[in-house]
Amino acid sequence: MNDLPVYLFVGFMGAGKTRFIQEILADADFCTSDKVLLLICEGSESDYNPSLFLHDNVVMHCVKNERDLTPEYLSTLEEKHNPKRIIVEYNGAWWLPAIYSAMPKHWFVFQNLCIANSIEFPLNAVAMPDLSSDKLEDADIVLFNRCQDSTKKHVLQAFVRKVNTDG
């Protein structure tokens, strides 16, 4: 089997993952005619507007339960849809090791993007420090949205640097 790149989008509910994914699937710089499997682990297919996708090559599949994330289940989806790349909108309440251990061996995380609401992130980091750190540890890119003039960017940057030692 060929290696399959996985674009992993992590962050808490309301952070803007769905909108970001919707926009990249409408972007000619990202999209090709290759089939994409979009695994939606938070929300539902109705959160997306396929008519805005650049191509009609996106297959959406909802994963409602973390227990469903198994190598067998994901392999079945791959065999059924034969994608060339995979996008995962990951549930912010689920721990990342669940998806890492569930990915078939030939799947690899090509890019891990953490999207965070700059207004809610400090509250989440205090209320759920381990879960917040889990989302940041392996992130290749951390995007803070909804920033305002009053946003204390240095506080957000300090938290990311503390947790994500590779960045």
Q: Where in the sequence are the language-model features?
A:
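Arginine/glycine-rich "motif VI" loop of SF2 helicases in the C-terminal RecA-like domain
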Residues: 107, 135, 165
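Long, charged, low-complexity intrinsically disordered regions
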Residues: 2-6, 160-167
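Flexible active-site lid/hinge loop adjacent to a nucleotide/diphosphate
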Residues: 121-136
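G-domain G4 guanine-recognition motif of GTPases
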Residues: 11-12, 41-42, 115-119, 139-159, ...
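Nucleotide-state-sensitive switch-loop elements of NTP-binding domains
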Residues: 2-10, 14-15, 19-124
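Short, aromatic/basic amphipathic alpha-helical patches
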Residues: 49-56, 154-163
